[in-house]
Amino acid sequence: MKRGTIPINNNFELEYRYYDKDINYKYFNRKFEIYLLEKKTLRKNYVLHMDNCETSSGKWAPHIHKAENVNKKLYFGVSTLNWSDIKNNFLDCIVDEIGEKNRNHAKKAVTKLMSPKI
């Protein structure tokens, strides 16, 4: 498993986890999770994350889980399996949470994410 963190600014960071290859994950060939975390003095607070946890047919595309309503998933849809499009959609969700003034910092962090297919 590959994991690491990418700082956005002094208050937020991205944490990624790319698991080992698994044939159950059709398009990306592995499970992955990317978390947006708020940095606090003594701990980190979970804000949202993107993953591809569903392996059933037609649900291969990544989706976002938000902290305030954990049961709600925002699906990108099968038509957006292009990694660049997925990163742009994820960037928009991050900016909605941390504010438009942090868009440039968030964009720099999101561009450092590598595709799970590699």
Task: Label every PLM stretch briefly.
Residues 1-38:
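Negatively charged, low-complexity tracts enriched in Asp/Glu with abundant Ser/Thr
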Residues 4-5, 19, 46, 61, ...:
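Small/flexible residues
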Residues 28-72:
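Acidic, aromatic-enriched beta-alpha/helix-loop junctions
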Residues 53-118:
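Mixed-charge, Lys/Arg-enriched low-complexity segments
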